[in-house]
Amino acid sequence: MDSTNPVFHGLREPHVNIIEKTDEEIRAAAEPLWRDLVKNSNEGKYGEFVKNFSGVMALAMNQVTAGHQFANSELARNLSEHFDYLGIIRRGEHVTVLYRQRSTKKDGEWLGRLVLGYEDGKIRIFGASIF
């Protein structure tokens, strides 16, 4: 061990890869994030919607795009608070958590996708969609 390595001096955290977490640990982290996305999408709260996004994702999801989505998508504003966990896919340094999502206004089911990984030592959202 090199004592000059900043990891051993607390200056930065050792590299963490989310795929090393168990399904239960990933699910425990993912479900509150998904619930917040559903709630904030329904309420059209852009600032709250993006608060757990990675830096790159937050930049890509600008306020104009999100505002248009919230204003013009009946689905995005009427997501059911009830969803079913379907599974986890691990790839590289990210996991994709899949959900069966329903609407309070439209019949049918949609596939919810939440991509998670670490950024600056915290679990962040790197992708989220419903299709």
Label each PLM-derived region with a short phrase.
Residues 32, 36, 47-90:
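Short solvent-exposed beta->alpha transition segments
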Residues 1-8, 43-50, 77-80, 104-110:
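Short, charge-rich amphipathic segments
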Residues 67-118, 127-131:
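Surface-exposed, charged secondary-structure patches
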Residues 7, 16, 38, 50, ...:
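Extended aliphatic helical segments
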Residues 1-43:
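Short, low-complexity N-terminal intrinsically disordered segments enriched in polar/charged residues
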